[in-house]
Amino acid sequence: MVLTELKASGEAPQWLTVEGFQSLSKGYLLPGETPNGMYRRVSKSAASYYENSEYWENKFYEAITKNWLCPSSPVFSNMGTDRGLPISCNSIHVGDSVDSIFGKSHELAMLSKNGAGVGIYLGDVRGRGASIKGNGKSEGIVPWAKVYDSAVVSVSQGSTRRGAAAVYLPIEHSDIEEFINIRRPIGDVNRRCMNLNHGICITDDWMRSMLLGDKQKRKLWTDILDARATTGEPYLFFTDNVNNQNPECYKALQLPVFTSNICTEIFLHTDVNHSFVCCLSSLNLARWDEWKDADLPNIAVRFLDAVLQEYIVKSEGVPGLECSRRSAIKGRAIGIGVLGWHSFLQAHMIPFESFNAMTLNALIFKTIRDKAEEETKILAEELGEPEWCKGFNRRNTHLTALAPTVSNALYSGGYSPSIEPIAANIFAQKSAKGTFIVKNPNLEKLLESLGKNTEDVWKSINGQSGSVQHLKSLNSGQKAVYLTAREINQHAIINQASQRQRWIDQGQSINLFFANNSDPKYIHEVHIAAWEKGLKSLYYCRSEGVIKGDLASRSKDECSSCEG
């Protein structure tokens, strides 16, 4: 049935777009299943883990069909089925032995086979030239990363999407200079990992020493920023910002966080026996006015705790998933995220850089945090505390994490992804059914009200890489509302992220956007501000070439598993 027929028969919500329906049809809907049938399947399965299952099924279904709660891709694909797992990604911790290195390769393969994007921490593996048993010398971490690079490609063959993994290394590691460049298509092909993403873990001590003038560190920092400007990576993981903000239960049990996931929003403990699990879904901020006084964050906590329970049940006895299952049982960490932040601001004619945006930013994320904390306490009393929460009156070590949500934003109504500014006001969205020109719906309404919603106007916007700053029909206030991501002062992105971080117990996927001619000093200052203001990580660095109005907004390097 076509979407219009499904809507007329009550089998699809009115807010579902053609592009969103086609996205769902490509791998989320079961054979013969309608969108509302999928929402019912997911709701019913989640509710089955509670005593009053009919009540919770209806609560979950209502939240989803109202377009308030937006489950992640793996939840829609696999919840209530026997075909896969409903979680988004994992991260593994590699020990300094051949046994651990290859044992974790098997774990990586099994996690990838089951649909997860995988983070890989290599910080414990000795560097190049270090002594090994038998009087030999280590070749360093890069050849082992190459093993994982091959595993990701091999295990995903025949899949609907390629596997995805990101390797992380501390900046103090002796192999760091080579590691920075493992994705550059130059040099020895055997020491390049073109199928892996990569991130660097940086301590406060290192940053302070670099800023105080250490020449070697300054050179390394320059190389990192150059690599980010050129390739978008490496991701940055600020080790002390992460661990200083750990929840009290983590601090009491001395559970350090070494690494993140492939989208840099998950910050959970790992060691060789514990691999973390990303259990994600998002709240739709574009509809904040509808649910701000409702119990939606409470519902989301209960929903995701059930999703995690389904993962625990399904993963029992599955080879390679033992470490992830162990972590899920002990901590029950979940990650409530958001989407539609910029869509919400534009619908209310609020500029991204404004004081009003900051005020709402604080109100929204404090509300989500407070209600989520309330519900995890209720669940602890109802279902008990897991091992890592004993004595803390909570069901989950962590509750919130802001994933990228690119796919989720598309199939949930075509809103802006996560807390990110819109990259372009018009772009081409590619799908299996063809290429569709996607226009910013809020801008389209504004132009219509001005009598300027014409093909010529949209062609001119496309010719300006999605910008409206050249339009004489818009006043300065309207132009400020519709600034694109690279036109916005990047300090505004950092300031908003820093402000909301106090109410987010995990982290945020924060992309930065720069024009090709951006002053290197400006790029440096924005990155330093992220660290100084307490951000836990930085995701991609987007140069102007990536953000074109005539290109799809999603990069091939982004992981659909983790898009919350």
Where are the model-predicted features located?
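Gly-rich Lys/Arg/Thr-decorated short loops/hinges at beta-loop-alpha junctions or inter-strand turns
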Residues: D82-C89, G127-G134, L474-L483, D505-S509
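Internal maturation/activation junctions in enzymes
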Residues: S105, I299-R325, I329, A333, ...
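Structural signal for hydrophobic packing residues in well-ordered secondary-structure cores
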Residues: Y28, S43-Y50, Y61-W68, H106-K113, ...
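Conserved, charged catalytic cores of large soluble enzymes
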Residues: M1-E51, E57, G134-V147, G158-L255, ...
